[in-house]
Amino acid sequence: MIFLPTVIDKNIKGDRFLDLYSKMLKERVIYLNGAIEDTMASLIVSQLMFLDSENSKDIILYINSPGGVVSSGLSIYDTIQFLKSDVSTICIGQAASMAAVLLAAGKKGKRFCFPNSRIMIHQPLGYAQGQASDVEIHAREMINIKQILCEILSSHTNNSIFQIFKDTDRDNFMNCKQTLKYGIIDNVLYKKWI
């Protein structure tokens, strides 16, 4: 069981206790923590859509994730691109694989990481079993997904598709300065800026 701390929310109607995630959501802050899968994606997408329906002020998306299921991540990515609100992405800890794509998906100029964050990009991982024709179908789909992810990273980083394909051939780990140079983020959040 996960313990969620409660905080006091002060407003004109009086004080009330909120769990920490509800308080963060009220402040337009979402925390993506852990492996990206369908349940998490559904929660993140619904929070993004709710906040966007309230008003078009910026939404802050903190990311600490090893990545996960590509289709789940793409549902979050597509939602971010669809919103009227700008989404500021901030890596705290790690943004690997699909999480790195989401980090890059934030509004240009509003993508950050903390000094000790680690970012990793690579090609999608998958497996297939069954008849040879089924394995071939899945292999073609993996190549298609790789193309889509490389196009997304290219559009957000201004690196060529060729460069992205080359850089994602194997696990490619970057520190915050390398991530900034690569174009996945726009700035590093040092203590003096917080």
From Swiss-Prot:
GO BP of this protein: protein quality control for misfolded or incompletely synthesized proteins
Listed CDD domains = S14_ClpP_2
Q: Which is one Gene Ontology cellular component term of this protein?
A: endopeptidase Clp complex
Its annotated compartments are: Cytoplasm
Short name of one Pfam family = CLP_protease
Signal peptide interval? none
Q: Does the keyword Hydrolase apply?
A: yes
Looking up PROSITE patterns in the UniProt record yields: CLP_PROTEASE_HIS, CLP_PROTEASE_SER
Reaction catalyzed: Hydrolysis of proteins to small peptides in the presence of ATP and magnesium. alpha-casein is the usual test substrate. In the absence of ATP, only oligopeptides shorter than five residues are hydrolyzed (such as succinyl-Leu-Tyr-|-NHMec, and Leu-Tyr-Leu-|-Tyr-Trp, in which cleavage of the -Tyr-|-Leu- and -Tyr-|-Trp bonds also occurs)
GO MF annotations in UniProt: ATP-dependent peptidase activity; ATPase binding; serine-type endopeptidase activity
Q: Which residues form the active site?
A: S97 (nucleophile), H122
UniProt entry keywords in alphabetical sequence: Cytoplasm, Hydrolase, Protease, Serine protease
The enzyme's E.C. designation: 3.4.21.92
User: Which HAMAP family does the entry link to?
Assistant: ClpP
What protein family does this chain belong to? Belongs to the peptidase S14 family.
Could you tell me what this protein does? Cleaves peptides in various proteins in a process that requires ATP hydrolysis. Has a chymotrypsin-like activity. Plays a major role in the degradation of misfolded proteins.
State what protein this is by name: ATP-dependent Clp protease proteolytic subunit
UniProt organism field? Carsonella ruddii (strain PV)
Tell me what gene encodes this.
Answer: clpP
